[in-house]
Amino acid sequence: MEIHFNNTYLEKIYLGLPVSGKPRYNIEVTEKFRKRIVLLENIENIADLRNFKGLNFEPLKGTKKGLYSIRIDMKYRLEFSIGKNKVTLLGIIIVKDLSNHYR
């Protein structure tokens, strides 16, 4: 899959670039986040996410309708939208946020 970031902070975390200020997430969360992005890059299509039961892939509701999420850990979820690349018919994942799901 093709990955695009709408969130510059998360893109810097993924690329291992320095971020200014106090870190928003601890080391364990950032490492799991990177692993999830690598997983998203390596899947063939969105339907493959359903094969990973531990990710708890789901569409979001309410004010976040149109977004999807997968689990980073019990506290954090990776929120993203899914678009289509009309030329190759590959899904394009646009990373929106890394949220504290229960706050």
What is the predicted function of each stretch?
Residues 40:
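Conserved phosphate-interacting/catalytic interface
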Residues 1-37:
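Arg/Lys-rich, positively charged N-terminal/basic patches that mediate binding to nucleic acids
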Residues 1, 45-48, 56, 94, ...:
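Glycine-rich, flexible loop/turn motifs
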Residues 44-68:
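A short, surface-exposed loop/turn module that caps and links secondary-structure elements
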Residues 2, 25, 49-52, 90:
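Short, surface-exposed helix-loop/turn micro-motifs enriched in polar/charged residues
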Residues 6, 29, 33-36, 56, ...:
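Amphipathic alpha-helical interface surfaces
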Residues 67-103:
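Enriched for short, Lys/Arg-rich terminal
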